[in-house]
């Protein structure tokens, strides 16, 4: 593609996403009128694709100067990045397929604008800020974190006394994790797997590692596709819930022997290891739905492999002697490294929370540490989404309100 064609392609993708994100459209309209971010700089490290671009445009419409880099080497869509870079008050430093050095160099370029507010997906930007650019922390009003993995990382920093700025855990908003993590991950993970493998899911043993909100979504959609789902877990309550939802539950050491297709969704490392690879079926397929590429032990798989080859775009086959194992998208985030990410309708809510939380940070002085999304913002996003869908809800009568706040009325 020429640069012009690249920009046109990105603009078309952004228009499509924009037309399916009505909540963010309402917020953008308010931002354009009120300019709540005028004079502020926002530094972002997110998956640079069409839905993210709509959020970036919304912040710029609110008066912010925005700089953005990627948060995964394989999730950037270069046409969207090119289109974003043509917008006023927006600089995009992301590119697809960058090496580790280039990845962090792009984050450095975002930090070079000296942002007042940050938005992260995985906390790499905040980590870089604390590790190498500490002199900037005094200027930072706060940040937002998009994903479960990043929130875990921030809580660990806070526990160690290392977090020196306020960060809102956008991931923990109900209008984020109940929809984005469950329905978004459930649909987009299988979109990435199906478009990459072009294989039938029905009748296969699908092993889902982790039964948090992302894992539930993956398991739910696998069931809908006709798979026999096996869940592995470390949490007894989640394991019990998975069983009551109709899935088989067992240790990974046992599941590894019978799985046809594996999807990791834990947010932790070394979920699939050398011991697992050695007992897997010939032709087993591995995909990761967690943020970082550490859930599948790729170093161990590389060391076991006698040879490797690309058998299909985005699928690498590892011949470990008596069996072949196929890995999708280098073990990176399958829904974005092998697909287009979550549907626009769920990202509409997630990014609405991001935009509102950026404004909240700009208008309120927060203490250092991890903060929840204010309940009123969470509820506001839900109401706007319902209105956009033409759905009305009931309201409590005065008698019902009195009953719910009282204690004297019993049997």
Swiss-Prot record:
<feature type="binding site">
    <location>
        <position position="121"/>
    </location>
    <ligand>
        <name>substrate</name>
    </ligand>
</feature>
<comment type="function">
    <text>Catalyzes the hydrolysis of S-inosyl-L-homocysteine (SIH) to L-homocysteine (Hcy) and inosine. Likely functions in a S-adenosyl-L-methionine (SAM) recycling pathway from S-adenosyl-L-homocysteine (SAH) produced from SAM-dependent methylation reactions. Can also catalyze the reverse reaction in vitro, i.e. the synthesis of SIH from Hcy and inosine.</text>
</comment>
<keyword id="KW-0378">Hydrolase</keyword>
<feature type="binding site">
    <location>
        <position position="233"/>
    </location>
    <ligand>
        <name>NAD(+)</name>
    </ligand>
</feature>
<dbReference type="Pfam" id="PF05221">
    <property type="entry name" value="AdoHcyase"/>
</dbReference>
<comment type="pathway">
    <text>Amino-acid biosynthesis; S-adenosyl-L-methionine biosynthesis.</text>
</comment>
<feature type="binding site">
    <location>
        <position position="181"/>
    </location>
    <ligand>
        <name>NAD(+)</name>
    </ligand>
</feature>
<feature type="binding site">
    <location>
        <position position="176"/>
    </location>
    <ligand>
        <name>substrate</name>
    </ligand>
</feature>
<dbReference type="InterPro" id="IPR000043">
    <property type="entry name" value="Adenosylhomocysteinase-like"/>
</dbReference>
<dbReference type="GO" id="GO:0006556">
    <property type="term" value="P:S-adenosylmethionine biosynthetic process"/>
</dbReference>
<keyword id="KW-0520">NAD</keyword>
<feature type="binding site">
    <location>
        <position position="180"/>
    </location>
    <ligand>
        <name>substrate</name>
    </ligand>
</feature>
<dbReference type="GO" id="GO:0006730">
    <property type="term" value="P:one-carbon metabolic process"/>
</dbReference>
<dbReference type="InterPro" id="IPR020082">
    <property type="entry name" value="S-Ado-L-homoCys_hydrolase_CS"/>
</dbReference>
<dbReference type="GO" id="GO:0033353">
    <property type="term" value="P:S-adenosylmethionine cycle"/>
</dbReference>
<feature type="binding site">
    <location>
        <begin position="210"/>
        <end position="215"/>
    </location>
    <ligand>
        <name>NAD(+)</name>
    </ligand>
</feature>
<dbReference type="InterPro" id="IPR036291">
    <property type="entry name" value="NAD(P)-bd_dom_sf"/>
</dbReference>
<feature type="binding site">
    <location>
        <begin position="147"/>
        <end position="149"/>
    </location>
    <ligand>
        <name>NAD(+)</name>
    </ligand>
</feature>
<protein>
    <recommendedName>
        <fullName>S-inosyl-L-homocysteine hydrolase</fullName>
        <ecNumber>3.13.1.9</ecNumber>
    </recommendedName>
</protein>
<keyword id="KW-0554">One-carbon metabolism</keyword>
<dbReference type="GO" id="GO:0016802">
    <property type="term" value="F:trialkylsulfonium hydrolase activity"/>
</dbReference>
<dbReference type="InterPro" id="IPR042172">
    <property type="entry name" value="Adenosylhomocyst_ase-like_sf"/>
</dbReference>
<feature type="binding site">
    <location>
        <position position="268"/>
    </location>
    <ligand>
        <name>NAD(+)</name>
    </ligand>
</feature>
<dbReference type="Pfam" id="PF00670">
    <property type="entry name" value="AdoHcyase_NAD"/>
</dbReference>
<feature type="binding site">
    <location>
        <position position="146"/>
    </location>
    <ligand>
        <name>substrate</name>
    </ligand>
</feature>
<dbReference type="InterPro" id="IPR015878">
    <property type="entry name" value="Ado_hCys_hydrolase_NAD-bd"/>
</dbReference>
<dbReference type="GO" id="GO:0005829">
    <property type="term" value="C:cytosol"/>
</dbReference>
<keyword id="KW-0963">Cytoplasm</keyword>
<feature type="binding site">
    <location>
        <begin position="289"/>
        <end position="291"/>
    </location>
    <ligand>
        <name>NAD(+)</name>
    </ligand>
</feature>
<dbReference type="GO" id="GO:0004013">
    <property type="term" value="F:adenosylhomocysteinase activity"/>
</dbReference>
<feature type="binding site">
    <location>
        <position position="335"/>
    </location>
    <ligand>
        <name>NAD(+)</name>
    </ligand>
</feature>
<comment type="similarity">
    <text>Belongs to the adenosylhomocysteinase family.</text>
</comment>
